[in-house]
Amino acid sequence: MASSETQPRFGQSVKGLLSDKVTSCSGDVIALTRQVLKGSRSQELLSQAARNMVIQEDAILHSEDSLRKMSIITTHLQYQQEAIQKNVEHSKNLQDQLRHLMK
């Protein structure tokens, strides 16, 4: 009878250990799933960051091109300003000459 009493206890302890192991494995599977999802999310974030970086690079290149064009326009405006100033001085000289002739 002693052996029949130990058998149910042994069977129960094996079932208990098995149940504990299943619970532990389930927890590990859940943790692994969370890590995989985190990794997947990290990959998505990295991909989005790379796309944003490309967009920013295009914007920077466009801005650089615009600045180059504005620099050229500024140079042309300076030439025009100098030409206008020379013409104003020349017209003042002509006005002085006309006044002198009218006297």
Curated annotation (Swiss-Prot):
Signal peptide: none annotated. It is found in: Lysosome membrane. One of its GO terms (cellular component) is lysosomal membrane. It comes from the Eukaryota. Disulfide bonds: none annotated. Keywords: Lysosome, Membrane. InterPro entries: BORCS7 (IPR032143). Its main location: membrane. The keyword Methyltransferase does not apply. As part of a BORC-like complex may play a role in lysosomes movement and localization at the cell periphery. Associated with the cytosolic face of lysosomes, this complex may couple lysosomes to microtubule plus-end-directed kinesin motor. Belongs to the BORCS7 family. PANTHER family: BLOC-1-RELATED COMPLEX SUBUNIT 7 (PTHR31397:SF1), BLOC-1-RELATED COMPLEX SUBUNIT 7 BORSC7 (PTHR31397). This is BLOC-1-related complex subunit 7. It comes from Danio rerio. The lineage of its organism: Eukaryota, Metazoa, Chordata, Craniata, Vertebrata. The gene is borcs7.
